[in-house]
């Protein structure tokens, strides 16, 4: 039977039969698990799989179909292992907040580079705009302009009040979408605003650490009335980069890619080389210094997100 993975708990997977929509609790066939996969999760939400029904609503996954794409990051404290956040994605939403918790530009850029590398369109959602003062609203506008200049769509939203949620729903129509961001950024509140019938758990920010409490432990996909599917993911504190070669990195910063052919050297890394179009654009102010800083950190293999 052909199915789609809707939920992963690490050892069990909820798989929906593509033909009937019936849900089955499946596990991985033993030998299939031991193929030397270095991911912490060999099967991800969004995967297309072949499975066999054992009894009732229990089943065994026997094959993963080739993935169109996926979003991947290095696992926490397990530098040799990776974690696939979700697969077969049409559109990613990154939920950004100025504070409680702070989403740094470095974190945003790491996520965007990974999405670019796998051909996944990303929209930045600046959440909680109903809670910001005038100075903070100006900062949101500045950041949104910075990322629009780099080629990204940005929407200011309030998941709590419903502001601009209709815009988000229009963008999602008929697509498989993933919602990502830090714990406490409002991902589950956003999904509840999109479809109140889902009743996803939400939690307040920890006052002591100003970080979100994890309310989503495992990734899970939901069907929406507008023909879309939305994947809710656990909050991410750090975003370790994987699988990107130094020579390719420029290609995943759209505003760098547009200029790289004007560099004197075809293999220019935009660090110390003469007549570099990217560094000239930096001096002219057409490329943001924060983006260049993120580029250098990723290029040099630095793992910090600030």
Language-model features and meaning:
Residues 11, 38-55, 65-85, 121-122, ...:
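Helix-rich effector regions associated with P-loop NTPase G domains
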């Amino acid at each position: 039977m052909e199915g789609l993975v809707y939920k992963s708990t690490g050892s069990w997977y909820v798989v929906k039969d593509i033909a009937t929509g019936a849900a089955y609790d499946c596990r991985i066939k033993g030998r299939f698990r031991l193929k030397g996969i270095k991911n912490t999760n060999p099967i991800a939400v969004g995967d297309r799989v072949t499975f066999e029904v054992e009894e009732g609503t229990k089943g065994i996954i026997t094959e993963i179909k080739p993935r169109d794409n996926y979003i991947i990051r290095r696992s926490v404290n397990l530098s040799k292992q990776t974690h696939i956040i979700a697969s077969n994605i049409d559109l990613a939403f990154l939920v950004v907040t100025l504070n409680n918790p702070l989403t740094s530009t470095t974190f945003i850029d790491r996520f965007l580079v990974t999405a670019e590398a796998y051909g996944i369109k990303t929209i930045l959602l600046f959440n909680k705009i109903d809670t910001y003062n005038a100075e903070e609203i100006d900062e949101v506008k500045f950041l949104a302009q910075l990322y629009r200049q780099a080629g990204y769509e940005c929407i200011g939203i309030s998941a709590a009040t419903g502001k601009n949620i209709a815009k988000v729903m229009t963008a999602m129509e008929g697509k498989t979408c993933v919602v990502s961001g830090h714990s406490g950024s409002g991902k589950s509140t956003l999904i509840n605003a999109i479809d109140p019938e889902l009743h996803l758990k939400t939690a307040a920010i920890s006052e002591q650490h100003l970080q979100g409490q994890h309310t989503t432990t495992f990734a899970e996909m939901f069907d929406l009335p507008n023909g879309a599917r939305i994947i809710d993911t656990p909050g991410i504190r750090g975003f370790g980069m994987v699988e990107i070669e130094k020579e390719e990195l420029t290609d995943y910063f759209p505003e760098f890619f547009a200029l790289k052919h004007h560099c004197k050297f075809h293999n220019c890394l935009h660090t110390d080389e003469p007549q570099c179009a990217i560094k000239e654009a930096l001096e002219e102010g057409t490329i943001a210094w924060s983006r260049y800083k993120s580029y250098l950190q990723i290029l040099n293999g630095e793992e910090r997100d600030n």
